[in-house]
Swiss-Prot record:
The active site is at H179. Keywords: Allosteric enzyme, Cytoplasm, NAD, Oxidoreductase, Phosphoprotein. Pfam families: Ldh_1_C, Ldh_1_N. NAD(+) binds at V17, D38, K43, Y69, G83, A84, S105, A122, T123, N124, S147. The keyword Cell cycle does not apply. Belongs to the LDH/MDH superfamily. LDH family. Pathway: Fermentation; pyruvate fermentation to lactate; (S)-lactate from pyruvate: step 1/1. This is L-lactate dehydrogenase. It is found in: Cytoplasm.
Length: 317
């Protein structure tokens, strides 16, 4: 028993997303140990107490505690959910100035602890802040992962499942690019239970392209609609973070549309962006390069360029 590996996750930021992520980790029994770190010590301690009180109902006993940056030293994953929130009407990219300063401090503190694991970034604009985390940390690019378009792809699969009357698990479709306004659907590879969506459109008059275009629009604007109604989005992204965490800790080699570094794939260099990638215990094991059609490739290149334009003033090559 003494030689058994203990999985440890350090969560930085016990706001809506962070506390929902902690709740998901415990309810799914994904990790053995969870330490919660927040500038608001009382909030983090309250979360720990609340979560521990439900431990009898969890599938796996997760040791949950309040901690400091020093506790990151032996963590397998440090998940960063801290940062300024997106306000109504504010785009994810408008958050960049505020959150870059916050991240420089956080990542510096984590690395000073001796941390040598995997960073998982959730804070928006996630593609920019994942790049920042990689730069500030000095870790290999494979060990810095952003939530990317995992949630966007899940939203897409859910909406397509409702439209076509199939379980989301049987809908295979990706949203790639920036987690934001320039993201795009990969229709050329979308299928329902193995049947290409394009084929379903051709064979069934009930299915219409303009209705599918509306689904894409709904996916892109989902966060804005939720923020209008309840002030923030957190359950969906927390579940996507839990899914990525599970893929890492259980060495799954699962393909997820995370924000990862591109070094020539899809004709793009030096940017973190949402694409399908193999995720395992080492972080990113490889990028899955879909063969995009001409329209998709142009849209993806534009998305990457939008991110690079935002990075340029802050990170000189």
């Amino acid at each position: 028993m003494m030689n058994e590996r203990v999985n440890k996750v350090a969560l930085i930021g016990a706001g809506f997303v962070g506390s929902s992520y902690a709740f998901a980790l415990i309810n799914q029994g994904i990790t053995d140990e969870l330490v919660i770190i927040d500038v608001n010590r009382e909030k983090a301690m309250g979360d720990v107490m609340d979560l521990n009180h439900g431990k009898a109902f969890a599938p796996h006993p997760v040791k949950t505690s309040y901690g400091t940056y020093e506790d990151c030293k032996d963590a397998d994953i440090v998940c960063i959910c801290a940062g300024a929130n997106q306000k109504p009407g504010e785009t994810r990219l408008e958050l960049v100035e505020k959150n870059l300063a916050i991240f420089k401090s956080i990542v510096g503190e984590v690395m000073a602890s001796g941390f040598d694991g995997i960073f998982l970034v959730a804070t928006n604009p996630v593609d920019i802040l994942t790049y920042a985390t990689w730069t500030f940390s000095g870790l290999p690019k494979e060990r810095v992962i952003g939530s990317g378009t995992t949630l966007d792809s899940a939203r897409f699969r859910y909406m397509l499942s409702e439209y076509f009357g199939a379980a989301p698990q049987n809908v295979h479709a990706h949203i790639i690019g920036e987690h934001g306004d320039t993201e795009l659907p990969v229709w050329s590879h979308a299928n329902i239970g193995g049947v290409p969506v394009q084929q379903l459109l051709e064979k069934h008059a009930a299915y219409k392209q303009d209705e599918l275009d509306q689904i894409v629009d709904d996916v892109k604007n989902a966060a804005y609609h939720i923020i209008e109604k309840k002030g923030a989005t957190y359950y969906g992204v927390a579940m996507s973070l839990a899914r990525i965490t599970k893929a890492i800790l259980r060495n799954e080699n699962s393909i997820l549309t995370v924000s990862t570094y591109l070094d020539g794939q899809y004709g793009v260099n030096d940017v973190f962006i949402g694409v399908p990638a193999v995720v395992n215990r080492n972080g990113i094991a490889g990028v899955t390069e879909l063969e995009l059609n001409e329209t998709e490739q142009a849209q993806f290149s534009r998305s990457a360029n939008v991110l690079k334009d935002i990075l340029a003033p802050h990170f000189a090559e």
